[in-house]
């Protein structure tokens, strides 16, 4: 109040008022500030001042022939004076209005195509809904976000080549369009832009917006997909937020979202297979997202998420050098440590072997709903400053930091045994054991941590063991802050290595990622994900496994048939039969397998007992490690639809139904495909027709190599002999005829000869 009185006093003296209002601004520093350099120091003032002049715009001289001197109201549109320092004329803002109303019209057909991203943005805003404005403290953290909705994911170089090819097709310069997306886009754009009158430079700018992902490091509280970022200025201020639902989705956001879901599913599935790394690669290479190969998306898409990064590491791509623990991304901002194995005792006297980080380090921790700054020494948390959306999120961050600190009081807070396992039923490593334990219940941990008196610091507050805020006391070293912690902006990518259990390490051997870090969150993908790999059959449940297994056998029947008779063990070990095993009751798997393998061996030994339908039906059961027993089965059980269902060894059942007349196979009422050869007529039709031009010499002769399928016969030279597998699973020796004249009689004699050769 005193100060205000003083000021009022001063202003009442006329001399003060005069000095403040009349003094000229001739101070050197001020003049320097506003006149040095080309950069405009006060653009808005400059603009207002310019527009207050009569002719603030300059235009090409030709404009005087295209625009009248005065408009309908008699106002002058351009000055006869030339612009100083150029041969342009001075023009009034009214001239622009005249031009917009009365100037020449041009074809507008190309505008929506060129300015596609703008037109789409208008549509999204038109159909978007803005909700109420809420006033509350905004915890914003800077994140790297995509600011450009509706783009393809080309690299800058790829996009440059496409733009040059589209806009300046005749310019010299090496342009190699290699990727599928480059070629598709180029073709599409060339067609769209025929006879386009818009300036090539503008077209190039707009194409760049459409082809390349542009990211900025912006303060965000809330949605980070590009359709939210484009309205960031409308949805969140320093102390307010406005609810908003976008009026449309864009493919780039959908790709990011679907990629994360596919990667999570694949990592989770690979982790439980016999060779996780090989399985992961096989699945990444055989999966498509929205019709694009997943490996192509991984190469181009900068999304950083644990599962996505594991897939990238497996493909030999560089990933971010930060590491993940408990769902938080840790980035070391200063300090260093060495690692040493140490044995520690839990509160339950269980011994744990942990890798202790010795040394002082500082980290930023960034999670989905909370962020923190952590300072720690060897097995000691010095300080943790957390901010988060709510109490729950803050607690999550605190637990992760306490476990990460490896403090003794945390390890002593363990009650009961630690025996958490991963999806493959392997014990988790000690750090994840501790994490899981306290994520389930952190009460003892918080109670045992210790409490301290705190100083009053602006924007900081203490937190008690029951997670209530306090200004006097806090758990030792812990503070809650109103301000968020920014994500690490330097997006440096490093070379990493990955072991067969999908643990990703940097070049110093620090573990950055492991399957334990992959989120269990399930979501529904926006784009169709097509997993061609048999390992992903089970993602849609047991029925899908059943249908897919039989479809696979039918599709590959030609090769399966040969392997069945020549090299059954190799066939039984095929990974396509792996998912099926989860449907067969564990206790009886071995017996079923032994029974089916014996049955198949009898079929191979006793000529003429080959039965296609039965082989297809029972084959998946033979894949389990067999147990020798004298047990016979008339039906085999599979667990689908929540209960055991029976597949009859001889004959049809609701699970496996083969229709002889239509040759269609239905599994649980679902169509599983058509068998191309008839299991019953075998010799009479197909073979006699196909064996025209071949002479049947007799029984199989091993000297002529493994049996060929009928399709492979066409490769034989005239006079060449080979073993061939015919419909009933029998193998006969044939020779390709030297003359074509006798082909007609072959089909009649073939049938007789086959019977003789067999019997």
UniProtKB/Swiss-Prot annotation:
Tell me the domain of life.
Viruses
UniProt-annotated location(s): Virion; Host nucleus; Host mitochondrion
Gene Ontology CC annotation, any one? virion component
The UniProt keyword set, sorted, is: Cap snatching, Eukaryotic host gene expression shutoff by virus, Eukaryotic host transcription shutoff by virus, Host gene expression shutoff by virus, Host mitochondrion, Host nucleus, Host-virus interaction, Inhibition of host innate immune response by virus, Inhibition of host MAVS by virus, Inhibition of host RLR pathway by virus, Inhibition of host RNA polymerase II by virus, mRNA capping, mRNA processing, Viral immunoevasion, Viral transcription, Virion
What InterPro entries does the record tag this protein with?
Flu_PB2_2nd (IPR049110), Flu_PB2_6th (IPR049114), Flu_PB2_C (IPR049115), Flu_PB2_CAP-bd (IPR048298), Flu_PB2_middle (IPR049111), Flu_PB2_N (IPR049106), INV_PB2 (IPR001591), PB2_helical (IPR049113)
Q: What's the stated role of this polypeptide?
A: Plays an essential role in transcription initiation and cap-stealing mechanism, in which cellular capped pre-mRNAs are used to generate primers for viral transcription. Recognizes and binds the 7-methylguanosine-containing cap of the target pre-RNA which is subsequently cleaved after 10-13 nucleotides by the viral protein PA. Plays a role in the initiation of the viral genome replication and modulates the activity of the ribonucleoprotein (RNP) complex.
RNA-binding recorded as keyword:
no
Family per record: Belongs to the influenza viruses PB2 family.
Task: Name any one Pfam family assigned in the record.
Answer: Flu_PB2_1st
UniProt-annotated site: Mammalian adaptation, residues: 627
| Xref: Gene3D superfamilies | Polymerase Basic Protein 2, C-terminal domain (3.30.30.90)
Q: What HAMAP family would the database entry show?
A: INV_PB2
Tell me a Gene Ontology molecular-function term this record carries.
RNA binding
Q: Where is this motif: Nuclear localization signal?
A: 736-739
**Protein name listed in UniProt:** Polymerase basic protein 2
Question: In this entry, which stretches build a coiled coil?
Answer: none
Could you tell me which SUPFAM superfamilies the record lists for this protein?
A: PB2 C-terminal domain-like
Oligomeric and partner information? Influenza RNA polymerase is composed of three subunits: PB1, PB2 and PA. Interacts (via N-terminus) with PB1 (via C-terminus). Interacts with nucleoprotein NP (via N-terminus). Interacts (via N-terminus) with host MAVS (via N-terminus); this interaction inhibits host innate immune response.
């Amino acid at each position: 109040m005193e100060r205000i009185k003083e000021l009022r006093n001063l202003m009442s003296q006329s001399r003060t008022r005069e000095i403040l209002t009349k003094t000229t601004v001739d101070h050197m520093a001020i003049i320097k500030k506003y006149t040095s350099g080309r950069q405009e120091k006060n653009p808005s003032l400059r603009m207002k001042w310019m527009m207050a002049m009569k002719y603030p715009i300059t235009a090409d001289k030709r404009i005087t022939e295209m625009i009248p001197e005065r408009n309908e109201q008699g106002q002058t549109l351009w000055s006869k004076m030339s612009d100083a320092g150029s041969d342009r004329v001075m023009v009034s803002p009214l001239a622009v209005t005249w031009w917009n109303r009365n100037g020449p019209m041009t074809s507008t057909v190309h505008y929506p195509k060129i300015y596609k991203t703008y037109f789409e943005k208008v549509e999204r805003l038109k159909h978007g809904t803005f909700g109420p404005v809420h006033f509350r403290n905004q915890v914003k953290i800077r994140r790297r976000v995509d600011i450009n909705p509706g783009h393809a994911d080309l690299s800058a170089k790829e996009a440059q080549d496409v733009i040059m090819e589209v806009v300046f097709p005749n310019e010299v310069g090496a342009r190699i369009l290699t990727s599928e997306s480059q070629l598709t886009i180029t073709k599409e754009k060339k067609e769209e832009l025929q006879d386009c009158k818009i300036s090539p430079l503008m077209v190039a700018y707009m194409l760049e917006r459409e082809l390349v992902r542009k990211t900025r490091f912006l303060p965000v509280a809330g949605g980070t997909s590009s359709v939210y970022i484009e309205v960031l200025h409308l949805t969140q201020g320093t102390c307010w937020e406005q609810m908003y639902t976008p009026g449309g989705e864009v493919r780039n956001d959908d790709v990011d979202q679907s990629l994360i879901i596919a990667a999570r599913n694949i990592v989770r599935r690979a982790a439980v297979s016999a060779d996780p790394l090989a399985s992961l690669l096989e699945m990444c290479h055989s999966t498509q997202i929205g019709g694009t190969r997943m490996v192509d998306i991984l190469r181009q898409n900068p999304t950083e998420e644990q599962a996505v990064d594991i897939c990238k590491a497996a493909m030999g791509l560089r990933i971010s050098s930060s590491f993940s623990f408990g769902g938080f991304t840790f980035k070391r901002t200063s300090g260093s440590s060495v690692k040493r194995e140490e044995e520690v005792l839990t509160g339950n006297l269980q011994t744990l072997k942990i890798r202790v980080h010795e040394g002082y380090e500082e980290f930023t921790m960034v999670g989905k709903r909370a962020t923190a700054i952590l300072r720690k020494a060897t097995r000691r948390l010095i300080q943790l400053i957390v901010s988060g959306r709510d109490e729950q999120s803050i607690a999550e961050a605190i637990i992760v930091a306490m476990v990460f600190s490896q403090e003794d009081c945390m390890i002593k807070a363990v009650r009961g045994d630690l025996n958490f396992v991963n999806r493959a039923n392997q014990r988790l490593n000690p750090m994840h054991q501790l994490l899981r334990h306290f994520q389930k219940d952190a009460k003892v941990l918080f109670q045992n941590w210790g409490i301290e008196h705190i100083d009053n610091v602006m924007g900081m507050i203490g937190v008690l063991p029951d997670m209530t805020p306090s200004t006097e006391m806090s758990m030792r070293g812990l503070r809650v802050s109103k301000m968020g912690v920014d994500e690490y902006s330097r997006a440096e990518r490093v070379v990493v290595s990955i072991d067969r259990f999908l643990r990703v390490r940097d070049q110093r051997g620090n573990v950055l990622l492991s399957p334990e870090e992959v989120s269990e969150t399930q979501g529904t993908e926006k784009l169709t994900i097509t997993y061609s790999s048999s390992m992903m059959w089970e993602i849609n449940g047991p029925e899908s496994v059943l249908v897919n297994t039989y479809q696979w056998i039918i599709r590959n029947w030609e090769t399966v048939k040969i392997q069945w008779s020549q090299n059954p063990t190799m066939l039984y070990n095929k990974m396509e039969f792996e998912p099926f095993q989860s449907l067969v009751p564990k206790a009886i798997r071995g017996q079923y397998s032994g029974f089916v393998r014996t049955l198949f061996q009898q079929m191979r030994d006793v000529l003429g007992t080959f039965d296609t339908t039965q082989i297809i039906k029972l084959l998946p059961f033979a894949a389990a490690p067999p147990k020798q027993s004298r047990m016979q089965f008339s039906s085999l059980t599979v667990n689908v639809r929540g209960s055991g269902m029976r597949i009859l060894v001889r004959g049809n059942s609701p699970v496996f139904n083969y229709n002889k007349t239509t040759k269609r196979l239905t599994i649980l009422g679902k169509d599983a495909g058509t068998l191309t050869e008839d299991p019953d007529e075998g010799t009479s039709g197909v073979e006699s027709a196909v064996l025209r031009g071949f002479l049947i010499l007799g029984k199989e002769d091993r000297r002529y190599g493994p049996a060929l399928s009928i399709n492979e016969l066409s490769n034989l030279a005239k006079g060449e002999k080979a073993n061939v597998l015919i419909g009933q699973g029998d193998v006969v020796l044939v020779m390709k005829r030297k003359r074509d004249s006798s082909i007609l009689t072959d089909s009649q004699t073939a049938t007789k000869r086959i019977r003789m050769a067999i019997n």
